[in-house]
Regions:
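Short, basic (Lys/Arg/His-rich) helix/loop patches that form interaction surfaces
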Residues: 17-24, 123-124, 132-172
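Catalytic-site neighborhood detector that most strongly recognizes the C-terminal catalytic loop/helix
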Residues: 6, 63-67, 174-199
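Conserved tyrosine-mediated DNA breakage-rejoining catalytic core shared by Y-recombinases
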Residues: 48-83
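Active-site/catalytic core of tyrosine-dependent DNA strand-transfer enzymes
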Residues: 6-13, 75-145
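Short alpha-helical segment immediately N-terminal to, or the first helix within
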Residues: 34-35, 49, 159-160, 173
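Short, polar N-cap/turn motifs at the start of nucleic acid-interacting alpha helices
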Residues: 52-58, 145-146, 165-184
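DNA/chromatin major-groove-contacting recognition/catalytic segments
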Residues: 14, 71-76, 80, 84-85, ...
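Basic, Lys/Arg- and aromatic-enriched nucleic-acid-binding interface segment
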Residues: 1-43, 47
């Protein structure tokens, strides 16, 4: 079933094809899958992903944790989720920030205006709490340990490893650059290589 760090292929396919009959649960499922399809993108980066960062057939974003800039090619799965949750009145690619705003004390914030960083961070925290509760219910229905966005991230890495993808490619896909030797090696990898890795992994 699920381990604490990754979701096995059987359960992943069950999750991806499951209609939970409730829009909130289906949305949480899609946010989990988006993270997986986007090379294990961190939930905080999903929250802060603006529509202006989608161009040239790719998502371009700066990791909140490291401030490094990454690009992820738009796969059919990513396009489908983005289209499903597109809100013409929102500056965000995904509904995460809106969910956080609706869960916070300040529900009147103009998301198209100059929102204070502290408010955005609060919305992110509330959104994370919101989705984790829903993922816990999804986990119960699937009969496995609790799903989190870290599980999506580790699942991507685990599947890439099982396909024989070199560790440096996996590190680049996840945005890991903490080890000096890995950083030196990754400098020679281009985006196309990493996108090809992601295409292989997400065709499960």
């Amino acid at each position: 079933c699920c381990s604490y760090t990754n979701l096995n292929i059987k359960k992943y396919r069950t999750l991806a094809g499951r209609d939970f009959g409730e829009s909130e649960l289906n949305e949480a499922r899609d946010m989990f899958l988006f993270s997986f399809y986007a090379r294990g993108m961190s939930f905080v980066d999903m929250c802060y992903l603006r529509k202006t960062k989608v161009w040239n057939e790719a998502l371009h974003y700066e990791r909140q944790k490291t401030h490094q800039v990454f690009s992820v090619a738009l796969t059919p799965q990513l396009r489908e989720i983005i289209f499903r949750y597109d809100d013409p009145g929102s500056p965000w690619v995904l509904p995460c920030m809106q969910r956080g705003m609706l869960s916070s004390a300040n529900k009147q914030e103009d998301m198209n205006g100059d929102v204070p960083p502290a408010s955005l961070y609060n919305f992110y925290c509330m959104a994370l709490h919101y989705y984790l509760i829903l993922l816990k219910e999804i986990s119960r229905r699937l009969g496995c340990r609790n799903l989190t966005f870290n599980v999506a991230r580790h699942t991507w890495a685990t599947e890439a490893r099982s396909m024989g993808v070199p560790t440096p490619h996996i590190s680049e896909g996840l945005g890991h650059t903490s080890e000096r030797t890995t950083r030196i090696y990754l400098a020679s990898l281009d985006r196309q290589t990493v996108d090809e890795v992601n295409e292989r992994v997400t065709k499960l």
